[in-house]
Amino acid sequence: MKSNQIRQAFLDYFASKGHQIVSSSSLVPAGDPTLLFTNAGMNQFKDVFLGFDKRPYTRATSSQKCVRAGGKHNDLENVGYTARHHTFFEMLGNFSFGDYFKRDAIHYAWELLTQVFKLPADKLTVTVYAEDDEAYDIWTREIGVPAERVIRIGDNKGARYASDNFWMMGDTGPCGPCTEIFYDHGEHIPGGPPGSPDEDGDRFIEIWNNVFMQFNRDEQGVMHPLPKPSVDTGMGLERIAAVLQGVHSNYEIDLFQNLIKAAARVTNTTDLDSPSLKVLADHIRACSFLIADGVIPGNEGRGYVLRRIIRRAIRHGYKLGARQAFFHLMVSALVNEMGDAYPELKSGEERITSILRQEEDRFFETIEHGMAILEAELEEMAKTGNHVFNGETAFKLHDTFGFPLDLTADVCRERGVSVDSAAFDAAMARQKEQARAAGKFKMAANLEYTGNATTFHGYDTLEAQGKVLALYKDGSAVPALNEGELGVVVLDNTPFYAESGGQVGDQGILKGAEGIFQVEDTQKIQASVFGHHGVLSTGTLRVGDEVSARVDLLSRHRTMRHHSATHLMHKALRAVLGSHVQQKGSLVDPDKTRFDFSHNAPVTADEIRRIEDIVNAEILANTPTLARVMPIDEAQKTGAMMLFGEKYGDEVRVLDIGTSRELCGGTHVSRTGDIGLFKIVSESGVAAGVRRIEAAAGDVALRHIQQQQQLLADAAASFKVPAIELAGKISQTLEQIKALEKELARLKSKLASSQGDELASQAVNIGGIKVLAATLEGADANTLRETMDKLKDKLKTAAIVLASVNGDKVSVAAGVTTDTTARIKAGELVNFVAAQVGGKGGGKPDMAMAGGSDPSQLPRALASVAGWVEERLK
């Protein structure tokens, strides 16, 4: 069966069982800020399962578009190198909302697999939750699966309900056991059945998961039976297609083979097994569907994930020899494959192609220069044996040449090199504000505008009617913007806050009679003229059009919480650290507040706790916020805090929030209680006498605390102790490690001595010099040196090469006794060997070290040492 036939057969089967066929939801989750992208079939039914949404049906089936790239679920780096990792995939599913339950779900699954898809029953193995006797009995007694092929899977050690066969929506809420169906590819494939030590092999592949939501977990962890149990199932189309088409890799199915051939055509590649072609076949699906669902390449959020995927695809095309835009040429092939099932691909083909072409043209301007720098750096590293790529250089590639970090890491990984991501993050943090100023703000400031000012209504409302006063594209005024075009819109009235005072600009939409403009940022073109930056997602927008301007409520509210929390934190910092504390810079956005301030020492843990206590006490007090506009001299008399060096007008806005009083034009909560919660996330130094605090407020703070609690719980579970005993257990373990390392060093020294005695007998006499070349299994550099010294003492007049292999790395040591260095140099000898194993080294005349990356050539290299010495002695 072809992939399209499999998809349709699945939907038709469940339609015949009374299920409503529901179209795939968008890859951009509607109303769920916890998700970056739709990544499961149940996402669109989440509120139905939770009881918040009622549908006219109780049975549903769908083929859901899913993306896993960025955030918690991120398969990007594995795509192209494994048989089953994808950024985009389709999830086939059937769902019961309080209708049928385990018996029908299991019978449906078995009937579809064995009677419709005609899979041999003896090729299927199933798992159930260890305590789910009901599912076990259905499989063994009703379906007739032999007991040895129905495997009970229990909890992970130390964690109740933490099992591959127990599903939970979150820490609380609907949950329940699941049963998974696996296909056995046969004994010729390595791997064991699920639950066995070899379960990670490729022999048994999960093809279908049936989740039985039968409990509601409360905050104390108690399970309460649901009055109407439900069913949520998921089967990857690509996986079942591989099984039905008799291939082992998803990339061998018809759908991918056609896309791989298309990728080969547009890159003029003849090797159809190239991993890079698989990358292109995968990435064209993710990119095209994301653009079809309204995601535009950008520098933040979903837009940046899309840009990363596009640029990773371009890099793989470049690796195949492409030197000009090619990726967009694959869109038509994708539409041919999937356009009937997903009409949005057909209707959006021209727009998708255009946006991809724009991104390609932009990146091809810099990729060659960037790759040259990257390759040169890697070549230098190979010479020195360094295996960690400089994070500052990685940031330069990102900042100057548009190389996402994972693209650089992808190239490095192919050479056995990792990237110093901590140094990259530090460089990013230092330059982020400068990049913002050099990018969006500079672009706004350079626009020429001579019309009327913008009236801001955003203190009182998040929606307003406005008239388009001006439009800009590529920095120039235009009469209209068309679908897919980036631009700037100026309105006479707006609820959108323009970036100022450290607070980022608002996002949202401008809806006209003929078009919708997605506002990605709002910047001031002039003091009282606001530019709405973004893209026209549909239709046309013209100068003079009336629009409905609507700010993204969730984003604005989060920003307001962070801004108000910043004022309270500033006041608390002065109370705890002293009146010398002055603001040196700030950034307030939906995800955090970042606050730079004058202070000469790191803020201690106790001081951080006291600052948090003060702010959270103000939040609990739930006092109203008061904003007043008054003459600046009157504001000074009230004691309002003013920022040193800031320019103020004759009239200023004074904000009272809690015990804080500052001049501020930003947007804020109505009462301190609206902030919800405050938590300091990090504290660091950014310059002499300047410290930086990053903090979170509201739901962002809550998520941070939950993540920290989960990390603590995971660590405690790993050590098999309650969380309260974790610190003591770690200290105990560190002491044990220290003792074991000491014992290991002693044993290595002893081993070196014994190996030296054994190896000495293998030396051959060449021209009066004893020559030895041998491998020491598992030896590190110190062990090689110690063994070398003992051999030199024992052999007296000698030239020695010792090597070891650890993973894909080769370590080589060359030693020459003092009486021989006039004729043979250790550095020359070690480089002779290292060159054959893909490395280079150096050292003193009597001792030198080297590294290599090709262990397969080591035996030949060692065998050639005697001949090299003989040639040197002639």
UniProtKB/Swiss-Prot annotation:
Among InterPro entries, the record links this protein to:
aa-tRNA-synth_II/BPL/LPL, Ala-tRNA-lgiase_IIc, Ala-tRNA-ligase_IIc_anticod-bd, Ala-tRNA-synth_IIc_core, Ala-tRNA-synth_IIc_N, Ala-tRNA_ligase, Ala_tRNA_ligase_euk/bac, DHHA1_dom
| Keyword tRNA-binding appears in the UniProt entry | yes
Return the Gene3D superfamilies for the record: 2.40.30.130, 3.10.310.40, 3.30.54.20, 6.10.250.550, Bira Bifunctional Protein, Domain 2 (3.30.930.10), Threonyl-trna Synthetase, Chain A, domain 2 (3.30.980.10)
- PROSITE patterns in the cross-refs: AA_TRNA_LIGASE_II_ALA (PS50860)
| Reaction catalyzed | tRNA(Ala) + L-alanine + ATP = L-alanyl-tRNA(Ala) + AMP + diphosphate
Q: Name one GO biological process term.
A: negative regulation of DNA-templated transcription
Q: Where in the cell is it found?
A: Cytoplasm
Keywords of the record, alphabetical order, are:
Aminoacyl-tRNA synthetase, ATP-binding, Cytoplasm, Ligase, Metal-binding, Nucleotide-binding, Protein biosynthesis, RNA-binding, tRNA-binding, Zinc
How the cofactor binds, per note? Binds 1 zinc ion per subunit.
* Note on domains (UniProt): Consists of three domains; the N-terminal catalytic domain, the editing domain and the C-terminal C-Ala domain. The editing domain removes incorrectly charged amino acids, while the C-Ala domain, along with tRNA(Ala), serves as a bridge to cooperatively bring together the editing and aminoacylation centers thus stimulating deacylation of misacylated tRNAs.
Its biological function?
Catalyzes the attachment of alanine to tRNA(Ala) in a two-step reaction: alanine is first activated by ATP to form Ala-AMP and then transferred to the acceptor end of tRNA(Ala). Also edits incorrectly charged Ser-tRNA(Ala) and Gly-tRNA(Ala) via its editing domain.
Q: Which family does the record assign?
A: Belongs to the class-II aminoacyl-tRNA synthetase family.
- Its protein name is Alanine--tRNA ligase
Q: What organism is the protein native to?
A: Methylobacillus flagellatus (strain ATCC 51484 / DSM 6875 / VKM B-1610 / KT)
What is the primary gene name for this protein?
Answer: alaS
